[in-house]
Amino acid sequence: MWLLAEHQVLTTGQIASLEFSSRRRAQDRLARLRSLGVLFAFRDSYMFGGTSEARYALGYIGARMIAAARAVTPPTAKAHMQRLERLAFLPTLTHQLGVNGFFCGLAAHSNPTRTDDGGAGRLTQWWPERRSAEFFWTNQGTDGGEARVRPDGYGCWESGGRAVRFFLEYDTGTESLRVLARKIAAYSAFYTDRFGVLLFSLHSARREQAFRAGLVKFLGGHDPGVVIATTARDLPGADDPAGEVWTLWSGRDHGPVTRLTLANLPERGPRVSHHAPELPYGEAAFQPGDKAIMPLLAAAPAPPREPAWWDSPSGLTPRRSA
C-alpha cells in the first residue's frame, strides 16, 4: 500500500516483480485486496479488441488506512473516487507507468523470492517526480537563480560497495529530441553533479542514436558539467535497467559503443548511512534538514564557462565572448 500511496499506480506485473514468486500468486492476493476495497483496479480497452494489463491504485479503504498511519484527515469517498477517475484518464499515464516500471526493474532485485539475482545490487532510494521536484526544484542554482530541475524520478543503486545516484529522464518518443536535449540546460544550471548522474532512457535504439548525435550539435562542444548516460528500451536485456545497457556520453557521436552496468557508472552524490526508511526502497534517502545534505544545495559563485547553445534566445546558435 505504501508504494501505491507514493507512486500512485502500478501494474500487476510490476507488483509481482517486487514481492511475489509468481504472477499468479500476485493476482490472487491483489484480487483479495480489491474485493476488500483496499485496492482499486482498472484497464484500458483497445480499439480493435482486448484490454491492457490491470493497473492498481489505492482503493478508498486503502486511502483511509494510509491517512490513519500518517495521522492526517482521510479523503471523502467522493473526493477519492474523483481522484481515481482523473488517474485512469491521465494523459501521461503511459509515461508514469513506464517510469514506475523502470524503478520496479531495479527494485525487483530485492524480491526475497528471487534466487537468480547473483548479487547484482539493490535500489536504496526511489523518489517519484513529485517528491524529487519538492526537493530539487525550489533550490537555488549555480547562477543564483531558480534551478528548474524536475526529473521523472531520482534513485540510488548500490552494488559491490558502490552507490550510484541518478536523475531519470524517461522518454516515450512524444517529445522532440530538441525539447529532450534542452532539459540538460536545467541540469547544467543545478548542482546535478553533487547529487548524481543523469540517465536518459530512450524508447528505441534508433532514437537513442539520434539523441546522442543531437547532443553533439546542441551542446556545441560545451561541457555541461553533468555525467550523462543513455540506454534504449529495445536493446537485448533492457528489461533490467541494472544490466549492461548504459552508454556514457563523451561529447562525440562516433566510435565503438561500450555498454556498462548501472553500478559501473560514475559515482556522484553523497554517501548516506542506511536508516529505517519512511517508505519502501528508502534506506539511503535524504532526511529532511540533513546537515550533511543541505550545504550541497547552498548557492556558490558560478565558475566561468564558455557560452552554451541554450544561452541564445533562439536556442540555435550560442553567443560568443567578445
Predicted regions and their residues:
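Leucine-rich, amphipathic alpha-helical/linker segments
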Residues: 76-108
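Short, charged/polar micro-motifs that form catalytic or ligand-binding hotspots
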Residues: 5, 16-19, 23, 88-92, ...
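Active-site metal-binding core of divalent-cation-utilizing nuclease and nuclease-like domains
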Residues: 89-96, 104, 115-166, 172-179
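Non-catalytic C-terminal interaction segments of nucleic acid-processing enzymes
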Residues: 174, 178, 182, 191-322
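Nuclease-adjacent, charged terminal/linker segments that flank catalytic cores
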Residues: 1-87, 294-322
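Short secondary-structure capping/junction motifs at helix and strand boundaries
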Residues: 41, 110-118
